[in-house]
Design a protein with these regions (language model features):
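Short amphipathic alpha-helix that is part of the acyltransferase structural core
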Residues: 1-20, 118-156
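Conserved catalytic-core motifs of GNAT/GCN5-like acyltransferases
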Residues: 104-117, 243-259
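Acyl-donor-binding surface of acyltransferase catalytic domains
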Residues: 39-44, 48-137
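Conserved active-site alpha-helix within GNAT-family acetyltransferase domains
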Residues: 91-104, 207, 230-248
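A conserved beta-strand-loop-helix scaffold within acyl/acetyltransferase catalytic domains
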Residues: 156-189, 193-197
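Conserved acetyl-CoA-binding loop-helix of GNAT-fold acetyltransferases
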Residues: 63-72, 202-215, 237, 241
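Active-site rim helix/loop that mediates acceptor-substrate recognition in acyltransferases
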Residues: 20-31, 145-171
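Conserved beta-hairpin
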Residues: 32-49, 166-180
Length: 259
């Protein structure tokens, strides 16, 4: 097992077919992270963000990768750090459940494909009487949920998000009532994270602010990404209305003590 040098990240990027957005963020060095491989052929790969989010890819028979995961999991338990492992492969799911089952719980999620034509032909919403503005430091300081700690967790720092990410918020007077931000972003992809004040739900705010996010993506030739838990029917429904189709199930394993 060895750590892939940043000089070889472009080779790794060509190797992977489909992966979570944070993988591309690591490979493009938008966020801090590491890439491990079982050997120089890159048959099995492990991606790690600084905050403890992982993605496993390739040949699931690699003993080196599963051993590395076990060591990282043990370290997270001892040091009370985050351990969240993404897997798009049933073979890897089986391997992880066999080897790490005592220490992790499994959550199933959907990732979607974005259909630009479906989005352009969607049922348009009436304009809402709320101010929509791009998120900057002032909005973060007065946020609904996505505060400095959030950006430190996923972006390494608020300044990195402000430089390389983007987001929007809706305001009712001086109060922020909905936010949509890129939890992860690369040159090609931007994964959306949305929150709406519970007092303003059912008004179509999530769809409205998501449209602002998607429009900004399309303006900059970026593909928007939408994921949700399989039992989050509200998010599934909103995504479907916005052109996110072809749901594909994947697994997220998290440390048993985390939830």
């Amino acid at each position: 097992m060895f750590k892939v040098t940043t000089e070889n990240y472009s080779i790794v990027k060509e190797t992977i077919e489909r992966a979570p957005t944070f993988v591309y963020s690591i490979l493009e060095q938008v966020i801090e992270g590491a890439v491990y491989a079982d050997n120089e052929s890159l048959h099995s790969l492990l991606f790690q963000t600084k905050s403890g989010i992982y993605y496993v890819y390739g040949d699931s028979s690699s003993e080196q990768v599963i051993s590395k995961l076990a060591a990282l999991l043990q370290e997270s338990i001892e040091q009370n750090k985050r351990f969240t492992l993404f897997s798009y492969s049933e073979d890897w799911n089986t391997k992880i459940e066999q080897r790490l089952n005592v220490y992790v719980n499994k959550l199933e999620r959907y990732t979607f494909s974005f259909d630009k034509n479906a989005y352009n032909n969607r049922e348009k919403h009436e304009s809402l009487n709320y101010e929509c503005i791009k998120i900057k430091q002032h909005q973060i300081d007065h946020c609904l949920e996505f505060n400095n700690q959030y950006y430190e967790e996923y972006w390494g720092s608020t300044s990195n998000f402000l430089e390389n990410g983007f987001g929007f918020c809706l305001k009712h007077g001086d109060k922020i009532i909905s936010e949509a931000v890129s939890i992860f972003k690369s040159q090609q992809f931007a994964e959306i994270d949305i929150v709406t004040d519970s007092n303003y739900r059912g008004l179509g705010l999530a769809s409205f602010i998501a449209e602002k996010f998607i429009d900004d993506c399309l303006l900059n030739d970026i593909k928007p990404c939408w994921d949700c838990d399989i039992d989050n029917h509200g998010s599934y429904h909103v995504g479907a209305k916005l052109g996110f189709t072809n749901p594909v199930k994947y697994a997220v394993f998290y440390k048993s003590t985390d939830r």
